[in-house]
Every structure is written in structure tokens, then in C-alpha cells.
Amino acid sequence: MKKIGVLALQGAVDEHIQMIESAGALAFKVKHSNDLAGLDGLVLPGGESTTMRKIMKRYDLMEPVKAFAKEGKAIFGTCAGLVLLSKEIEGGEESLGLLEATAIRNGFGRQKESFEAELTVEVFDDSPFEAVFIRAPYLIEPSDEVSVLATVENRIVAAKQANILVTAFHPELTNDNRLMKYFLEKMV
């Protein structure tokens, strides 16, 4: 059975663990770099990207997460996870630099502009994915290496590149585990 870690610094950690388990894998909380040992994949949950980055630096997790990805292990970032995984963040904040695109933080607005939308996701059949956007980012300027999986208002809200999968929305806050199953079956 595949072993997936969830970076447990803040955000919807328990919801991701439930989603991983519902998709048929074992889930583990990751708080320190040694927690990455033996994992097949990693989830970077939503939360506040600046705070998450500061905590990752405090616990010396930035370089170990980069090394995890460079070993070819899969990483799934949602919302703040998308921001942290991007090569660049608008405004010049430090990132992990693992996805060849630029992240626009809070691209759809602040908390009061949060919304839900039915998305067509390229890797699914025709049934829409009910997506929850909370202070959501989006991506711009993807390289040719990046596959766009979904857009809202012509803004990139889901993408993948090699072993990296990102969404601007929160699949863990729905009952639809198709994205987690895709991550487990196609990327891990």
C-alpha cells in the first residue's frame, strides 16, 4: 500500500489524511524532515503560504522537500501548496521552485471572494469537479513542461509537471476523491 505524507504545519491536514485514506493509501503527518523517509508521496496542504514557508524554514524542511521531489517522488500541492511549489511567486517571495510557473497569491481576491465552481478537469471524464476556492491563487506563465488541467475565467487553477500536481482549490474539502486517486494512480 502506498504511503503518503501530509505536511502537518497548518491547514486542512486531517481532511487530506481522510482523502488519502478514502483513495486507498496510508496517510502520515510530516512535521520534521526525518518523517519523509519511506514515503511514496507528499501533500502540501492549503493554509497561508507565507506562514507555511516560515515554519518550513524554522523546521529545516525546505531543502528536504526539494530533495524528495528531485528523487522523483510525487508532491501534490493545494492552494498554499501550489504557491510554495511554484518556481516564482509574484512579489518575489521565496518558493520551493519545483513547478515551472509563477503563482499569483490571492488571485481571485480575499476571503469574501471565496467561491465554489464546477470545473472540467482534463484528466477526468466529462463529469465536472466541484471545486472550493478560498482566497485562491492561480498560475501564470507556465513553461512548456507544465500541463494545464483546469482553468477558471482563463486562469490556471490545476496543473502538473512531471511528479508535481497542484490545484488552486481545495479538493480535500469535498467528497470527490478523484484528484487524490489520480495522484496515487498516475503520479506516485
Swiss-Prot record:
Enzyme active site: 79 (nucleophile), 170 (charge relay system), 172 (charge relay system)
Record Pfam families: SNO
Q: Keywords on this record? A: Glutamine amidotransferase, Hydrolase, Lyase, Pyridoxal phosphate
CDD domains, from UniProt?
A: GATase1_PB (cd01749)
What catalytic activity is recorded? aldehydo-D-ribose 5-phosphate + D-glyceraldehyde 3-phosphate + L-glutamine = pyridoxal 5'-phosphate + L-glutamate + phosphate + 3 H2O + H(+); L-glutamine + H2O = L-glutamate + NH4(+)
| Amino acids binding L-glutamine | 47-49, 105, 134-135
Please give the name of this protein: Pyridoxal 5'-phosphate synthase subunit PdxT
Taxonomic source organism: Listeria innocua serovar 6a (strain ATCC BAA-680 / CLIP 11262)
Lineage summary: Bacteria, Bacillati, Bacillota, Bacilli, Bacillales
Gene name, Swiss-Prot/TrEMBL: pdxT
